[in-house]
From Swiss-Prot, chains A, B:
GO-annotated cellular components: cytoplasm
Family: Belongs to the SurE nucleotidase family.
Protein name as it appears in the record: 5'-nucleotidase SurE
Gene3D superfamilies recorded: Survival protein SurE-like phosphatase/nucleotidase
Alphabetical list of InterPro entries matching this protein: SurE (IPR030048), SurE-like_Pase/nucleotidase (IPR002828), SurE-like_sf (IPR036523)
Pfam families named among the record's database cross-references: SurE (PF01975)
Cellular localisation: Cytoplasm
Catalysed reaction equations from the record: a ribonucleoside 5'-phosphate + H2O = a ribonucleoside + phosphate
Physiological role: Nucleotidase that shows phosphatase activity on nucleoside 5'-monophosphates.
């Protein structure tokens, strides 16, 4: 199996190197990842500037390329320029810190996987729960096991798996659960400061809110030391609300 | 009604000024938009750098603020810092060029509206179909009419409306249709060039693919000179596939 690996923490981040080394024991791995950290870039792509691609001279069992862009850029270039064909699987990660609830829309890691899904490649995003104490070895070992058990070819087009792994030693992981993207979100606030020339600037801060009644909420699996596996798609239509609107509004003519 | 207006083309773009001027005839409008163009930034937010907020000294019927960040940053700062409370409505646009099909995941304009939806504000993204010949007056006039007819307070939490308006004179618009985010996407390719110091760089290009069998596909309404109105949510779980996975895999224990 040929696996394309990307991330949003940058090409030299500990998480991606741990993942690529672990996968390369069994699979052919190619890393194509951002030159610089791209956390929280969402599904940004680079249209107004060109992209530089560089093969790194690093002594590993796999090839490593850096791209002067975002995770989604890396996936596009990885497929079209580096590999010249679709890989059998794309994995984006291992992210430093979790991607649960509304994180999914901000996350560069998740967007890397969704870009693979758009391109028609079975794709997985993987994150280690704790930003302060990520345990990449646990997540990498889990992914290796998961690929034995889960038929990634069954993942439908335009859909990816969003996997979050508790930051605990591997032998404390109880297993994995199929979960749903939860309503976990942030209550934002801004810390105001004054720069040396008198201008106001602001740091974005946020408090996590976890109050989703759904027993399948992604964060609840993690709290019990299970890995959460959420299938997510690039189609955002709210079907239930669309149906209600259709009942209320016919197609409307103007005038 | 208090309306917060943002966009991704930047605070001085023609589209946002046309929208804000039109809306300010009837509503209290505050513009909080990116200092510089942020097209295709997706749902990026600025976490590693602070944000600068500046009130512009521009002679209009409404206040204009610029933020040194993304559309999602603008919405967060617009609510928490500029207004200090939730507006009654958020509108992101008018974008130069359409946001149909998979554009939705790349679009800064759409992300602005989804950020409003996360914050619990009724939110709308609006785009003029043509990048080359956008017709902002048509889109702005349509939005004014639409707000008379559509109860924005009925939009559920975590959901926004993604509106695309054909680039034709207003009297050629036939009406509006409720639509679904389509499978419209791009077949990417990269044009390789060599920089003056001998390095390779690449321009991302793409050919549009429109082959969605769904009669409610967003782009089909536009082709018939209807405005497309697609309700989209920030929850990406693929429910159908989740159900199939649940039938196949029980919650899995390791060891």
């Amino acid at each position: 199996m040929n696996i394309l690996v990307t991330n949003d923490d940058g090409v030299t981040a500990d998480g991606i190197l741990c993942l690529a080394r672990t996968l390369s024991k069994k699979y052919k791995v190619t890393v194509v990842a951002p030159e610089t950290e791209q956390s929280a870039v969402g599904h940004a792509i680079t249209l107004r500037l060109p992209l530089w691609l560089r093969k790194l001279d690093i002594n590993e069992n796999f090839e490593i390329y850096s791209v002067s862009g975002t995770p989604a850029d890396c996936v596009k270039m990885g497929i079209d320029v580096v590999l010249g064909e679709k890989p059998d699987l794309l994995i984006s990660g291992i992210n430093r810190g979790n991607n649960l609830g509304t994180d999914v829309v901000y996350s560069g890691t998740v967007s890397g996987a969704l870009e693979g899904a758009i391109a028609g490649v079975p794709s997985i995003a993987v994150s280690s729960y704790s930003f302060e104490n990520p345990m990449y070895e646990t997540a990498a070992k889990f992914i290796l096991d998961f690929l034995e058990e889960f038929d990634v070819r069954s993942i439908p087009r335009f859909t990816a798996l969003n996997i979050n792994v508790p930051s605990v030693p591997y032998d404390q992981i109880k297993g994995w659960k199929l979960t749903r993207q939860s309503k976990r979100m942030y209550d934002d606030y801004f810390e105001k400061r004054v720069d040396p020339s008198g201008g106001n600037y602001y740091w974005m801060m946020g408090t996590i809110i976890e109050d989703d009644p759904d027993p399948k909420a992604d964060y609840k699996a993690i709290a019990e030391n299970y890995v959460s596996v959420t299938p997510i798609s690039v189609f955002l239509t709210n079907e239930e609300y669309l149906k209600r609107l259709e009942e209320r509004y016919e197609d409307k003519t103007i005038r």
